[in-house]
Amino acid sequence: MQKLAAALRAAENFRDLKIAEGLFYAGRRNRELAAVLQLSENEVSLVKHRLIKRLSQFVREAGQLISDTVFTGTASAGLLTAAWESLRPSCPKRTTLGKYSLGILPPNWEDYVRFHLDLLGCSFCAANLAELQAPVDTAEASARLNRLQQSTVGFFDRAGS
């Protein structure tokens, strides 16, 4: 899954990445995703088929035997969702979330991050974004830096000896 998400991100193929997230992470149906992404249900089905083939290929390359039918059915869908949630292969990096909060992402990235946060509701990324947007208590940050510097003074003195 990480390899698939990385390949889609590298190619800036956000349409397919949104479909992958919607299907494998959020467990959305083809029809629902088609409506949200303003695509035909056939387009979503075709992309889903290609994504499943790529996932199967990646698993085979990793040395595991798998059949194309493993990704169908309720149990497998739950397994994919759990794995996607655990690995978070399509979550934007904190730097990307920071740029999103500042409004300086390229339009295609901004659209993807908005989809990931607002439509899929990724709680991990929402928490990261909230942390990035939280006001900084400068007095607390200064006290923390001072404690850090005080705790390392002896270490650096010994390192030079």
Q: What kind of feature is each model-predicted range?
A:
Residues 1-8, 43, 78-83:
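Short, Lys/Arg-enriched N-terminal segment that forms or immediately precedes the first helix
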Residues 4-32, 93-96:
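Short amphipathic alpha helix immediately N-terminal
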Residues 24-29, 105, 121-124:
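Short alpha-helix boundary/capping elements
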Residues 31-64:
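DNA-recognition helix of helix-turn-helix
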Residues 48, 113-135:
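A short, amphipathic alpha-helical patch
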Residues 52-95, 134-160:
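C-terminal edge and immediately downstream basic/flexible tail or linker adjoining helix-turn-helix-like DNA-binding
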Residues 80-118:
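Short, amphipathic alpha-helical interaction patch
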